[in-house]
Amino acid sequence: MLDPTYPAFPIFAFLGIVCCLVPLPWHLQSWNSGTCFLMIWTAVACLNMFVNSIIWKDHAQNVAPVWCEISIRITLGASVGIPASSLCIVRRLYSIAKKFRAVMVDALICVLFPILYIILQIVVQGHRFNILENIGCFPAIINTPLTYPLTFMWPVLIGVISFIYSTLALIQFNRHRLQFTQFLHSNSTLSVSRYLRLMALAMTEMMCTTPMGVFVIILNAKATPVSPYVSWAVTHYGYGRIDQVPAIIWRSNRLLVASYELTRWSSPAIALIFFFYFGFAQEARRNYAAAWGWVRRAVGLPERVPSLPTTKKPFSSSDKGSGFAEKFAAKAKGLSSFNVKDFTSEFTSKAHDFTFKAKQYTLPRPMPQTPSSSGFSSSDSTRFGSSVDGKELPSPTTKEFSSPIPIHLSGMQTLASFDSNKDLPSPPAYDVEAQYGPYNIDNRVSYHIADAGVRASYPMGVAYSSDSEHRRIVPQHSTVPQHNTADEPASPALPDTPSSCSSSATFSTLQSRDFIVLPSTTDVTRGTGSLPTRRSPAGPPRLPSLSQLFGISSMTRERDVEAQVEDVATGTASPTTTAPAPASTTIAPASATMAPATTTTAPTTIANIQRGEPDVPASPRTHRASV
């Protein structure tokens, strides 16, 4: 009778052999003993079934008795060797630290235990073997009560133990995931990906072999009657006989067909599952490439297959891409003779011709000098070209702003009139502070510093930079270096445009989002007084409040300020509402045209200075210069 599974079964059995033997070398190098034993047992079982299916595909003659003696031992050993290998895999995953001891234990489980199992089968083996048509050699195990604990129980028991180990390993991996991952990364032979693939392989094998073992037990109990085990002599009477069973007989019993087919198809199925987990991994692809290189060199094949000719013409010197490459190379070659000095001088000359629109920038309202009861709308704003105190505010692009604050840009030391560090002195810096007064809005006081060369950083408010004809309004807690001397070089004329700057002892860096520097045109000799100063503290900088950072104040205080400014502008300030002006100091400029410094009689004391300090810290980006 022809085998309905022929030639499908021999093909899959051969594929199982290949799938198990191909990954074996690199698993041997990494000393994965459980995986190696699983591959060996599966490959041997597939080889056994492959040979049997080829030899006895259409008959049941005893043509290879010696092979049958070996074949039945392989079948018995593989029935427990494969589950035992799976047990070794999950046990190794549970305790992966002790490698040498694990290899020895795996060898005992996967080699010694199957050998003992094969020896014990002699107790329930009634004769030498059976030859089943289409299947081949098969063990002749009698169906007695002693057969179940000696033969059928072990695959199921090993599967249960493997399930317990795999559960414990998964719990341990989930509980100590971080430490486990670090340990796996330190292990050169076991990665997280391989760990998970091994666990998946072991669990898949358990889900296949354990239920199948239970099913085989049930089938054997129902397919043939269970005979009592009498004695050794009765069981082994006529031990030398060989039963030859045609396919038409054993295929007539569906339970026997299911039992035999499950037994022989299990090995190729496990081989394919193993290859599915490990045959497409990164190390497998790397070894495939190495093997192909060896075969290619042995056969003499070229390293790469020559590509077919295309209709596209190769690039020539007349192509657009080639011309672009030549132009780019010529320009790159010209960079070697690039003169930075000529470039910056040319840029400087062009920067002087750069202009802005007059009404593009908006100035904040000028701070009042004396309080007043009248005010103006909070929506009013002062722009370039408008007038304050009867004087028109010129555009920052006019020549009146002839002394801009020198600012330094990294990598652009010679750009326009941005002077280099050598052109700036390094005077000691002081904090400008004032006595607290009843009309100080948000603890802010305006000071008048008559010095055309003042260079300062302002953590809050606005500073005004101009020549000696105009005022510089310096908010409270601003860092103001000493005035320039006659020996200092004059800064080149450049329109004073809004810039962001941060201070240091030499004012040598430019940083964004710090301060705004804009011009002012108010008379510097008006309302000046003594200016108390003290050295910069060594403590950390302070952070501004939201109102100081964004220039926001309450509507009531804003209207009071507007009223005070209106009274000052119209000259109608009430003497009864005038508070004593805070102490201030006028720093005389180097120019002889400036008014002499005047001071008020208000005392300058530590208490007054501390009382005038704001409740919120200054900006953390303010770098105060130390002496």
Curated annotation (Swiss-Prot):
Transmembrane portions of the chain: 8-28, 36-56, 70-90, 103-123, 151-171, 198-218, 261-281
Q: Polar residues composition bias: which ranges?
A: 519-533, 545-555
Give me the ranges of the annotated region Disordered: 363-405, 479-505, 518-627
**Membrane topology note:** Multi-pass membrane protein
Gene Ontology process terms (BP): pheromone-dependent signal transduction involved in conjugation with cellular fusion
| Cell location | Cell membrane
User: Which UniProt keyword terms apply here?
Assistant: Cell membrane, G-protein coupled receptor, Membrane, Pheromone response, Receptor, Transducer, Transmembrane, Transmembrane helix
Instruction: Write down any Gene Ontology CC term.
Output: plasma membrane
* PANTHER family registered for this protein in UniProt: PHEROMONE A FACTOR RECEPTOR (PTHR28097:SF1)
Function recorded in the entry:
Receptor for the BAP2 pheromone, a prenylated mating factor. The receptor/pheromone interaction may have a role in the fusion of clamp cells.
Q: What is this protein called?
A: Pheromone B alpha 2 receptor
What is the species of this protein?
Schizophyllum commune
Name the encoding gene, please.
BAR2
